[in-house]
Amino acid sequence: MPRRAASPALSENDFDITKSLFNDDIDGNDDDFGNTTTKNVEPLDANGILDLGLESDGDGDGAFISAQQAAANRKASNLKGQSVKKGGGFQAMGLNSHLLKAISRKGFNVPTPIQRKTIPLVLDNQDVVGMARTGSGKTAAFVIPMIEKLRAHSVRVGARALIMSPSRELALQTLKVVKEFGRGTDLKCVLLVGGDSLEEQFGFMAANPDIVIATPGRFLHLKVEMSLDLSSMKYVVFDEADRLFEMGFAAQLGEILHALPISRQTLLFSATLPKSLVEFARAGLQEPSLVRLDAESKVSPDLQSAFFSVKGAEKEGALLHILQDLVKMPTGLPENALNATDNFSKKRKRGPDGPTKKLKPTEHSTIIFAATKHHVDYLASLLRMSGFAVSHAYGSLDQTARNIQVEDFRTGKSNILVVTDVAARGIDIPVLANVINYDFPPQPKVFVHRVGRTARAGQRGWSYSLVRDTDAPYLLDLQLFLGRRLLLGRDCGDSPNYAEDVIVGALQRNEVESKSEWITKLLYDDDDLTALRNVAGKGEKLYVKTRNSASSESAKRAKEVVASKGWMELHPLFKDVTNGAEQARLEMLAKISGFRPNETVFEIGQKGKAAHSEAAEIMRHRREKIIPRRQKEEDEKAAAAAAAAEEDNFDSPAEENDDNDDLEVTVTGGDDDMAEASDGELEVTFSKAAQKGKGRTLSWKDSENFMSYTPKTINTAEERGYGVHSGSYNTASQNSNFVEAARGVTMDLTNDDGAKSFAEPSKAKGMRWDKKNSKYVARANDEDGSKGIKYIRGESGQKIAASFQSGRFDRWRKAHKVDRMPRTGEAEREGPASAGGVGRGFGTRYKHKQERAPKEADKYRDDYHVRKKRVAEAKENRVGSFKDGSGKSEIKSTEDIRKDRKLQERRKAKNARPSKKGKY
């Protein structure tokens, strides 16, 4: 019996050592296998086989197999003879071949740290909470394992994966990534966002999709309207989870989470996530794995930032100064827009000018973030009048218009995109060079998301921020959150580091003044632009009232920072364009702007007897009392600071770590930048500032046995900035202050029997007095926003908008003749009608069977000969009226005969003529 041929390796990780075992005497060729001859074949040693190799060296066999496997991994070859990439990247994660091809087609060679840490955990069916800085590949980290787990389209009705996004642009971008990685599979993916046709989305959900990418509001609308059953969901992703779990999406997420099955796998991803998962308790995480990468860097190391101190009335001029002198923004239409205009034609194009050509943004592409949509409209109009190519987008803009504006910026048809924070998260725009914060962000994590649009995937980028005096507390909060040094003016020296320091300075005075004057003239000439500016000013007043407040510590420090000399010094970016005379001019202007006269309004211009008036004497005596007291306080502060500095010089290093400033940081742990959250990870700890000038007292803390209520590894400023509930500093929901947190959880047992106490209003329980309408209104309406709006109770018991049950789905179902929607778990119908219900369901194709002959040709028409030819063809083919067959039946029925007789009798009675038979 001939020896069996060698089998090829089953997969990339398997290898064939048959040739080595048999000394390469077998080549595996089936044609020559029967003629194979053995050379120097030794007889089998039965004793050696029966001894089970006890006398042989097992380590030698293991070493031999390891050597063969290493050789196979070093260089393998596929069936075509081409070299295969080494394992260790995506190939080592056990992904299928179609997905690996899609990954390589996308251009991914090596997984990023967040992908390397999370993909194995997700494939192991674990709940994951992942945080990594912007541009690190978080979208692919949950899309790749999702496609690997779903594999193919399910014949059972019901979606299996849900991806929630806070904005429409982010959902659209996620859809593109899913389509790119899903090539080679038959998975169905739908996009459900606001602004699109609701009827079309009914059809999408009726087509039994596998993956649903949606925003919370529209998905809840479809769920309530269509009575969707979400029990088939196995894979749920919350992209930008900290934004989704804020109060704005509380009602929508509560209803959606209630409908999801408990056995689902839940993933949370964002660039800004707190270490504590208490705020995500509603997500239903089950023993999640927390992965926080680059927690200490927060922003890309390739990002360079500059902060400019400006006055409120000069912000528009400062913006033009940055665009023209720093960004070097060209005016007019970009080259891509000109090419698109010149090559416009209705004829379908192929090749390099066809629709497959991918246009890229220009090297001057800049995003400008504004506070409200009114600012966006005003700035977009102002920049267009300045000659720039501008696109704009905000939340309430029509969805089609938003897509057009963002796509124009993506393809390089415009250089500037003016947006609100709707585009601050997740939007990936390639080759984005600059980010400008026209309105300074009120939260540190919003700044992280804004500047994360640039310096992505190893590319360098710049961020410019305009900081008014009122924005200084938010700047200090950001500086504490990032853990960087704050340098004012020329304090940075000759070699400033814009990537690691927060450097604040002023813009060039003459440039800002000239551009501000030009804008003033433009506003004087254009009434429409003036109206837009007035509306933006009113919107800013409301925005300032409703934005989150800064921390009290930063508010106190901000007064000193703004009053310092370096606040209005020229920024180091302009050190090469200024000379000594310009610097002296700036110093003189700073002195003039900070000048405060000694005389009051009662004393200025008073001479002679008027100088000794009663009002002037009162102010003079008061000044004599206040000025020495103020000078004494300043001297005491200076002496206390000097004494504290002398004591610090004699302190040990261990004591210095306990008495650092608020600005100084203590770094503990190793420098592992890719570890899960643990007690030993790298954290930045801000120590409490000691009281200066009051003398040092012995601490009552026992260093060996004292236990603090806060872990040493907690960075207060960082956790406060990462807070989910809007990052607010003035709410008890923020656990940054133990006293505030304790006050928020206290339980009051007064009036527990429901009896009304003395002097309590009769309608005070659950009600409040509305001053505007002069009546009591429910306090619950203030919490959920249902002021004058009709609400219904959802399945979870929460109030949702009554407009979600408008009956539009029932009308759509009747219009498309869908008897009923298939239930979750039922088998999908085969054929074209599988998209709808039973019988003549949605998606059924109808074939027209009626045949009509062409009309007779008209000799006065231009196409007479063509029509004549068509008529001849119809006669030849016997189509329509020219078709052969039995003629019309002329046999009358009894009813026809009866009708004819009645008609004849009626005519006879009418004419009254005798019959011809009467003549004879």
UniProtKB/Swiss-Prot annotation:
The leader peptide range reads none
Q: Which UniProt keywords apply?
A: ATP-binding, Helicase, Hydrolase, Nucleotide-binding, Nucleus, Ribosome biogenesis, RNA-binding, rRNA processing
The places in or outside the cell where this protein is found are: Nucleus, Nucleolus
Its GO CC terms are:
nucleolus
Task: Return one GO MF term.
Answer: RNA helicase activity
Q: Which residues form the Helicase C-terminal domain?
A: 339-503
Query: Which segments show compositional bias classed as Basic residues?
Result: 904-920
Q: Specify the Helicase ATP-binding domain's residue ranges.
A: 119-291
Class in the EC hierarchy, top level: hydrolase
Return the InterPro entries for the record: DBP10_C, DDX54/DBP10_DEAD-box_helicase, DEAD/DEAH_box_helicase_dom, DEAD_box_RNA_helicase, Helicase_ATP-bd, Helicase_C-like, P-loop_NTPase, RNA-helicase_DEAD-box_CS
What EC number(s) would the UniProt record show?
3.6.4.13
The answer to whether UniProt assigns keyword Transcription to this entry is: no
Query: Which residues bind ATP per the record?
Result: 132-139
- Region: Disordered; residue ranges are 337-361, 623-668, 749-770, 813-920
Domain of life per record: Eukaryota
- Ranges annotated as biased composition (Acidic residues): 645-668
Motif, DEAD box: chain positions = 239-242
Pfam families per record: DBP10CT (PF08147), DEAD (PF00270), Helicase_C (PF00271)
**What does it catalyze?**
ATP + H2O = ADP + phosphate + H(+)
Biased segments, Basic and acidic residues type: 351-361, 623-638, 813-831, 851-878, 885-903
Residue ranges of the motif Q motif: 88-116
Protein purpose: ATP-binding RNA helicase involved in the biogenesis of 60S ribosomal subunits and is required for the normal formation of 25S and 5.8S rRNAs.
Q: Which family does it belong to?
A: Belongs to the DEAD box helicase family. DDX54/DBP10 subfamily.
Domain notes per entry: The Q motif is unique to and characteristic of the DEAD box family of RNA helicases and controls ATP binding and hydrolysis.
Name of the protein described by the UniProt record: ATP-dependent RNA helicase dbp10
Species this protein is from? Sclerotinia sclerotiorum (strain ATCC 18683 / 1980 / Ss-1)
Recorded name of the encoding gene = dbp10
